[in-house]
Amino acid sequence: MKLKVTGAGINQVVTLKQDATLNDLIEHINVDVKTMRFGYPPQRINLQGEDASLGQTQLDELGINSGEKITIESSDSNESFSLPPPQPKPKRVLKSTEMSIGGSGENVLSVHPVLDDNSCLFHAIAYGIFKQDSVRDLREMVSKEVLNNPVKFNDAILDKPNKDYAQWILKMESWGGAIEIGIISDALAVAIYVVDIDAVKIEKFNEDKFDNYILILFNGIHYDSLTMNEFKTVFNKNQPESDDVLTAALQLASNLKQTGYSFNTHKAQIKCNTCQMTFVGEREVARHAESTGHVDFGQNR
């Protein structure tokens, strides 16, 4: 897991094992931590007081998941030093690709754009889970799963022979969709919630299997990642913030639809801005992109 730690002279991203404990985190940052704050609503751990016995507790049991921002105070802090009264922060002006979470303005859900190169689904998932590009690894994961389960992923489901599909999805120009989302979600044990801009709804893959989830945004032909405060991408459906995050995601989708950010591939004609050909349906658009390498599309209105 990756955590952003600030305070006590520290401002860094920390990488730990998924089963890391509170002590593992403290040893990694090498600071005599007095207190730490995290989460939404904010939670506080007093390591030199009532919470001193929590050292061997796993971070996820404390509600600290990958992508969390943690603010620490060290024992070396001079508590007697008088700080000037805090000045009110100017109200942040949100961009069209941002939405306040819970209405407080403290947390913001925003679009993290990924490359528009026919691998956008894989880019979006890779950023949401790993914070880095793992497109080739994800494609290989899908290919192996398809080959290993020819009954589940039969020719009728795949719309082509099983072995052909397993080879086809390895090509960087091949578009991914629901099949790939489901396979990757199962393999990485994290639910994937797809925010559909045109339908203004969230399609949840494996929400009954996994508590942790990532959010990816779909405008009809392109996927992007969604992040909280430009860093957190993995959420937990049992955490208090989850409902507010999902509400903000739908509000953001509605706003983006009104600004023409989405494409209705079921009804509207989609135009290739490279060659000016027009298509109806995501499959037609995908086939054209895969055969030509064209990735710049617009909607005829």
From Swiss-Prot:
Residues 218-222 are annotated as: His-loop. Residues 109-229 form the OTU domain. GO terms for molecular function: cysteine-type deubiquitinase activity; zinc ion binding. Residues 243-248 are annotated as: S2 site. Residues 114-120 are annotated as: Cys-loop. Its EC number is 3.4.19.12. Forms a complex composed of CDC48, NPL4, UFD1, DOA1, SHP1 and deubiquitinase OTU1; within the complex interacts with CDC48 and DOA1/UFD3. Present with 2770 molecules/cell in log phase SD medium. This is Ubiquitin thioesterase OTU1. It comes from Saccharomyces cerevisiae (strain ATCC 204508 / S288c) (Baker's yeast). The gene is OTU1.
